[in-house]
Every structure is written in C-alpha cells, then in structure tokens.
Amino acid sequence: MLGTALRRCAVAAASRAGSRGLLHPTPVPGPTAAIQSIRCYSHGSHETDEEFDARWVTYFNKPDIDAWELRKGMNTLVGYDLVPEPKIIDAALRACRRLNDFASAVRILEVVKDKAGPHKEIYPYVIQELRPTLNELGISTPEELGLDKV
C-alpha cells in the first residue's frame, strides 16, 4: 500500500514538472492530499495492558524457547518504557530455569531494579511478589549475592 502511494506521488510529481523539468516544477495546489493518504500508518489497534502481559507470559512460557530467544525477548521488553509486571518476570525466570541459565535470571532481576529507576518502592514490591518463585527455583537476588555493593 505504501509503495503504491509513493509511486502515485512520484508519477504525479513527474507529470506536474511538465516542460520545466524536475528541478523547477510548476507549483500545483493540493499536494497534501497525496501525502496525507500515506500517513495513515499509525492507526493500528492498540494493545491493552492485559493483552501485553499475556503476550509476554506466553512468549516466555514457550516450552522450546532457547537462550537466544530469551535474551531477545528480555532485550525487547527492557526497551519499553515500563517495569515488567511480576507475572512476566516470573515467566522469564522459569524460562531461565528450564535453560539452566542462572546468570540470565540474576541479570533479569538487575534489569528490573534498573528499570524501576528512582522509584525505590517498585523493586522491593517485585521481589516480594516473586519471592515464592525465587525460592522454588533456587534463584538468589543480586543483593543476596552481594552484587549491589560492586
């Protein structure tokens, strides 16, 4: 659709140029109509918070997830302007456990602390919500490992 609209704009510009050439096109009123037709690309459906959470939980709960997909998913998730919900982090930690990747599990907890930024109440809340999972999976927090003092 975008390619077709761009071709139409190029053809229209070439026909407006006429005998004066492309360097000195004849001004024609109304070129914004052609441009506006290609600027409708941001009108997609918007994802609710619940759908967002469900999408990421499903992603990390894939039984055949590999280490690269885990890192890619976490990298993408960290790129968003939010602190992931505890249920998303829970699914990511369980994926780490399935892969026997303790380092990634600790790194995920470090990233959550970093994403919380100056809001000091967020990270303790997330750890409190994840405590049963951390105990079940045998994952230590960065503070328990002494990494917060480095």
Swiss-Prot record:
The modification N6-acetyllysine is found at residues 87, 113. SUPFAM superfamilies: Cytochrome c oxidase subunit E (SSF48479). Pathway: Energy metabolism; oxidative phosphorylation. PANTHER family: CYTOCHROME C OXIDASE POLYPEPTIDE, CYTOCHROME C OXIDASE SUBUNIT 5A, MITOCHONDRIAL. It comes from Otolemur crassicaudatus (Brown greater galago). Keywords: Acetylation, Heme, Iron, Membrane, Metal-binding, Mitochondrion, Mitochondrion inner membrane, Phosphoprotein, Transit peptide, Ubl conjugation. GO terms for cellular component: mitochondrial inner membrane; respiratory chain complex IV. A motif (SIFI-degron) lies at residues 2-17. Gene3D superfamilies: Cytochrome c oxidase, subunit Va/VI. The gene is COX5A. This is Cytochrome c oxidase subunit 5A, mitochondrial. It comes from the Eukaryota. Signal peptide: none annotated. The keyword Acetylation applies. It is a peripheral membrane protein. Residues 1-41 form a transit peptide. The modification Phosphothreonine is found at residue 141. One of its GO terms (molecular function) is metal ion binding. CDD domains: Cyt_c_Oxidase_Va.
